[in-house]
């Protein structure tokens, strides 16, 4: 096998996000449920023999040293693999949205190259590499929606009794984006939410909890409030995902979403029962 085409990298929604504390080293302690949705970037991989890692942007331009390139090079370094790869990236998930697009691209890159380069690394071995790339990357290797704690490093796929029922969501990305660091460094960020339980979450699923980052994000980015108000005008209860600026709402009735501002990304998504590449790795 010398190539893999049309490799999906799905986005995620944070159904809730509580900040429960802060470590002495400054990292925040979180609780969240990360849910996979069917809004995907698409990646293409062609093996090269000279060890070079190159990337082609098939849609919007990406930074020269983005997470896709970093993931490929981290895998080379960890394994001593002499092979290279040319990666084509068709970007559909908006950046600075809280949807995890860059992290998902990195995870799909690890999974695809583990197969193409015949490395046979286990999920846990890939997880160790993913940790060096960013807090959200390991989640996209776990294969399913998950309960996430700690600094994002404690990941538990939802057990059968806690799994999410199928649902559709309106996801709205305003034109403006947000720098995550500005939110976590803000003095008014709530950092003392009570610890939640998986059973408590499972009792209400999509109505559970809140996003502790949202008040600060709304103060920094008024478009988030505008997007939530727009969803509410449709009879939908919006909340922010991750550190924004995207917001989402479960669709519970027929709704027309065609009158959004032209600069916004609006997409109706469904949740995924499992990651489309879940069976590409063992362990």
Swiss-Prot record:
Pathway: Isoprenoid biosynthesis; isopentenyl diphosphate biosynthesis via DXP pathway; isopentenyl diphosphate from 1-deoxy-D-xylulose 5-phosphate: step 3/6. The active site is at residues 12, 136. Gene3D superfamilies: 3.30.230.10, GHMP kinase, C-terminal domain. Keywords: ATP-binding, Isoprene biosynthesis, Kinase, Nucleotide-binding, Transferase. SUPFAM superfamilies: GHMP Kinase, C-terminal domain, Ribosomal protein S5 domain 2-like. It is an enzyme of class 2 (transferase). GO terms for molecular function: 4-(cytidine 5'-diphospho)-2-C-methyl-D-erythritol kinase activity; ATP binding. InterPro entries: GHMP_kinase_C_dom (IPR013750), GHMP_kinase_C_sf (IPR036554), GHMP_kinase_N_dom (IPR006204), IspE (IPR004424), Ribosomal_Su5_D2-typ_SF (IPR020568), Ribsml_uS5_D2-typ_fold_subgr (IPR014721). ATP binds at residues 94-104. Pfam families: GHMP_kinases_C (PF08544), GHMP_kinases_N (PF00288). It catalyses: 4-CDP-2-C-methyl-D-erythritol + ATP = 4-CDP-2-C-methyl-D-erythritol 2-phosphate + ADP + H(+). The keyword Translocase does not apply. Coiled coil: none annotated. One of its GO terms (biological process) is isopentenyl diphosphate biosynthetic process, methylerythritol 4-phosphate pathway. Its EC number is 2.7.1.148. Belongs to the GHMP kinase family. IspE subfamily. Catalyzes the phosphorylation of the position 2 hydroxy group of 4-diphosphocytidyl-2C-methyl-D-erythritol. This is 4-diphosphocytidyl-2-C-methyl-D-erythritol kinase. It comes from Acidovorax sp. (strain JS42). The lineage of its organism: Bacteria, Pseudomonadati, Pseudomonadota, Betaproteobacteria, Burkholderiales. The gene is ispE.
